[in-house]
Amino acid sequence: MMQSFVQYTPTKVVFGKDTQKEAGKLVSELGITKVFLVYGGGSVIRSGLLDEIKKSLDEEHISYEELGGVKPNPRLSFARKGVEKAIAFGAELILAVGGGSAIDTAKGIAIGAANPGTDIWEFWKNKKELKKALPVGTVLTISAAGSEMSNSAVLTDEETQDKSGIGSDLIRPKFAIMNPKLTYILPKYQLTCGIVDIFMHTIERYFTPVHGNELTDEIAEGLMRTLIRNAAKAYENQEDYDAMSEIMWCGSISHNGITGLGRPKDFLCHKLGHQLGAKFDEAHGATLSAVWGSWARYVYHLDEARFANYGRKVWNIDEKNDEKTAVAAIERTEEFFRSLHMPTCLGDMKMGVQPDEVLKEMAGKATAGDTMKVGAFQKMGEKELYEIYKKANHR
């Protein structure tokens, strides 16, 4: 039965070619006069994108300060540095130029700049209630995290190797500028990591204990089919505007809540993946594809019909037996990941196969020392997470 829900998606989406030139206008519409720009590596500089955005701000007489250098698995220490600079500048809006790492960092800065005197990690760890944040705007350059429309952000505390998320509608971006052509220059690995992340944001909403939610199911299944088709096209030709457009829009819809309305989300694989990202600095999408198959084989027997439905609706598997269809669906999903040259076990990543004590340590961190259960399809503690890591711990 569909559960009660509240859907709030206030982000203004400006989608299409050359839309980055509208950044200044969108900021001006909000009555903002001082912007703090946040971005990652040199690609936004080399491509001329940053200059285009600055020009659009200049045309609207908007002053700005900037902070570049955001890294994948965005660091808490860097966000703290941004908070200090944004406060000193008197920023009124944080504008992220990049992918999920830049956007999540911007969200962290937006929280900190609106709450001077309180460390942002206090909000992340629920020690302080978040009541205000500066507005955030985004110019998307990587289709992946969906942070351009979501109410969540993830940062990593390098000192403790703790990768954690926060969720609040206060940090949903005011606008998202989405030009698929900006993704043409992505390294292939970034493209495929992003595709996996998009896929996982929906599949981890799809496998939950709540049934009888037809429209949400159809939206989720349609998104996954669309992504699978266009992933192959984009992998062959990254300048296929239609394919890159579909992938970019899938990324936003996959993580703005729509593919999981009326039911709880699982996101246990994200918990597993976050530990791999925090400890070994592995790419987020890779950590997800590396553990999903092991999770699926661990739980599918609890609801073979659900996995079989996924196999029939998403992979068009023509098999009447539910168990055979469920197993085939898991195999087809892993084949999809491998077709993108993404890992399907820990040994496929640079971290390699790990000793038992490392697996137990990560399982413990993911469950706060076995003090909480995670997931929704099956609630799990430290022991179960360790077993899934163990299943994935091979070459």
Predicted segments, located by residue:
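A glycine/threonine-rich phosphate-anchoring loop and its flanking beta-alpha core
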Residues: N115-G212, N309
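C-terminal charged capping/lid subdomain of soluble metabolic enzymes
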Residues: F307, V314-R395
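Active-site segments that bind and position negatively charged phosphate/pyrophosphate groups
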Residues: R205, P209-R332
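ATP/NTP phosphate-donor binding region
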Residues: M1-L93, L346, K373
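Short glycine/serine/threonine-rich phosphate/pyrophosphate-binding segments
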Residues: Q20-A23, R46-L49, L76-S77, S101-K107, ...
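Short Gly/Thr/Asp-enriched flexible loops that form oxyanion-binding sites at enzyme active sites
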Residues: E52-I53, G82-V83, A102-P116, M149-S150
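Glycine/serine-rich anion-binding loops at beta->alpha junctions
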Residues: A91-K107, T141-S147, K279-E282
